[in-house]
């Protein structure tokens, strides 16, 4: 494929136009008075959103050079979203400001490498300052405020405060679409997996069609159980202990299953068999999770444990197990808290390592099931367009709240950045182009606040100067137009979101400033014209 090249200042200007196109589309959504953006879809209703990363993902420009700039700006939004789950618009606005001012200085003769060193040093200093300004999330009130600011809806804030109260910071909160118009919260205590009883004869509560085992043993088996000889020695021991038994295995069939069913019907003892969830390596991992939670050992040939040789100490126990035809819930497993904490740490390390979104989601689910439960928030709305927009806002709010619990909170409304750059007053002792790089960050940091104010119909630069003169923690509440103590008023931002936005913006801006050449594919029509197609037919009609 033939390539086109663009060099020097012309190349950087093209990148800047691309960054501008994307940033201008995104920054109108900033703040409580921000506008929405409507995105056309190839099929179905258009999407209405005020989420920076959703808008950014849709932007593709016609000019290939400008498109490179837009894609770089898109990277700012997606990276911030991956790390913090929110703050994508802030990150894009910061990147635009750094690129603008930076390129002006490069055109005036500043060395891009010097600017980059200054920017990096400034970002590190501001990032540390933000951390020192942060305070820990304190109870449901703070969580409700953070979620309210992110979703721009107090009802969502209250609901998420309840959700996190129930499942803790590692718990899974999933957002699903509902057929009603209401917002609802479903909480599942303990570990639940999507496999039910193998035979309906195991049911203990005929009315609810579920099997309930109180204070039960749990057998976790990696293979199939078909022959009753393998199972009999264990069943006799369980019978003596007079406790019910849950069997989780790849499958239970043949005479092993019929023996369990017959004994259940006769009332000799109460047992329920369910298939293991998942498949392949994921099934092995989930079985180990269940074993850790209940204090069991996974019975498998590969670890030298045979079913006909095990004692009761290889079984786990749980206070209550409920099995329906579709799923199994284990509440209060007897696994030791150290083992569970170790398993949780191991899964967290896997989450950090994985590149696949699907794997990450599945690992997060396993994490939640080990650490306390699952909340499902059901979102309803009057139209499909409104439903999608609402669901998106709530997902963002969940991410923002999680980020807040992790690293703490600072005053919102763009004021934390304006106050944090006070550490750059002396340009960090740098000189020359590095000092200019530090100054770039100091100037760019006020842009999110300026656009929050502009979108609220106020004079941006005036607001920035006013907030700068206020003490740390105070700023503009754009929803009311008043200058208040933002921490007291509940206008809060997760510090992780603000730091990620600044870091990712600086990273992309530095790339643009140090770029000198752009290489893109030549367009098809250019190739056709230059190739001079001489394939004309000369058929003469008689």
Swiss-Prot record:
Keywords: ATP-binding, Chaperone, Cytoplasm, Isomerase, Nucleotide-binding. One of its GO terms (molecular function) is isomerase activity. Its EC number is 5.6.1.7. ATP binds at residues 29-32, 86-90, 413, 477-479, 493. GO terms for cellular component: cytoplasm. It catalyses: ATP + H2O + a folded polypeptide = ADP + phosphate + an unfolded polypeptide. It is found in: Cytoplasm. Gene3D superfamilies: GroEL, GroEL-like equatorial domain, TCP-1-like chaperonin intermediate domain. One of its GO terms (biological process) is protein refolding. Pfam families: Cpn60_TCP1. CDD domains: GroEL. SUPFAM superfamilies: GroEL apical domain-like, GroEL equatorial domain-like, GroEL-intermediate domain like. The keyword Acetylation does not apply. HAMAP family: CH60 (MF_00600). Belongs to the chaperonin (HSP60) family. Together with its co-chaperonin GroES, plays an essential role in assisting protein folding. The GroEL-GroES system forms a nano-cage that allows encapsulation of the non-native substrate proteins and provides a physical environment optimized to promote and accelerate protein folding. Forms a cylinder of 14 subunits composed of two heptameric rings stacked back-to-back. Interacts with the co-chaperonin GroES. This is Chaperonin GroEL 1. It comes from Kineococcus radiotolerans (strain ATCC BAA-149 / DSM 14245 / SRS30216).
